[in-house]
Structures are given as structure tokens and as C-alpha cells.
Amino acid sequence: MKNICQLLSEKDFDVICPNLLNQETPFEYSQEELAYRNFTENIGFVNASEEIKSLLLDIKDKYKKVYIVGFSVGATIAWLCSEEDCLDGIVGYYGSRIRNFVGIDPLCPTILFFPEREQTFTVDQLISSLEKKNIEIHKFYGQHGFSDPYSSKYDEKSAQEALNRMVDFLLKH
């Protein structure tokens, strides 16, 4: 997250990165399952999206444009916020739980990045259910985490291509 915040800042975007975990230190990569369980049991998608919507209300008048960029759980949270009229766009990387909220129709430009495969669902099936909506979807070589340079699933080529598409999307909208 810090890398993406830094990169976007270097491209002259103001970046706000809220701490949705309500704890000082992040989970270690080896604690991925524990981190996800903590999120689902103690925070949840609805509560997290309400926290982000509240933040959006606080900042919307301070900026010409407001976007949400989310990874994994954050991508699903961005998706849940996509019906807010104060958003100018969302970017979602491997938001696997979007599959639980396919009834949402984003009101803002939306770009989603998925890996070729996920452990818990069929990526092509989710993409197929989302293609009817007016959103941009890209599938990249690799697995969940392909854009995270600290992940064992990191794929440099896919990460760079997704990053370029994200920046182009943000500049376009």
C-alpha cells in the first residue's frame, strides 16, 4: 500500500490511505488467513465501506476529483462505494468478493484487474457476470497478489501493465 501511495503521489495525485484495521502494525504475509478472518469477523465489508463513504463526504469538496483505489478486500470495498455520486472513478485489483455483490451498478467509471486464476472461485465466471455493466475489466497472468512486489505471487510484467492501465485510467477520467 505504501508503494502505491508513493507512486501516485509522485504522479501528483493527493493520496489518503485510511487504516481500516484499527491497529498500528499490519499483519505479516504469513498471517494472510488470520488477517482475512480478522477483517471478516471484526470489520466486515459493509462497515468498511460505510467508513470510506463517510471519508468521501468529508473530502469531496476539497478536491476536483475523487477516486478509490483498492486491492483485494479494498477492491471490494471500492466496488461497494461505486454507487456514490461523489466519486469520479474506482480502481479494483483482485476484488474476489465482488462476486458477492454483482448486483451493484457503478455510477462512476470503473476499472477492475483480475488474475488468471483464484483459489476460491472461477475468474472468468465473475468477469462474465460483470461484462454486462459499463466497466473496464482486465485479466492478467498470475494469481491473487500479482501486483504486490512483496508477495510470492508477484509478476513484474503483469504488475507493470496493470499499473500503467491504472494511471492511464486516472488521468483519462
Model-found features: residue ranges?
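Serine-hydrolase catalytic machinery in alpha/beta-hydrolase-like enzymes
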Residues: 1-61
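Alpha/beta-hydrolase fold nucleophile elbow
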Residues: 60-71
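Conserved loop-alpha-helix segment in the C-terminal half of the alpha/beta-hydrolase fold
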Residues: 124-135
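Gly/Ala-rich beta-loop-alpha elbow adjacent to hydrolase catalytic centers
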Residues: 70-74, 78
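A conserved short beta-strand
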Residues: 86-96
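Acidic catalytic loop of the alpha/beta-hydrolase fold
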Residues: 116-121, 129
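Short beta-strand/loop motif that positions the catalytic acidic residue
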Residues: 111-114
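C-terminal catalytic histidine-bearing segment of alpha/beta-hydrolase fold enzymes
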Residues: 134-173
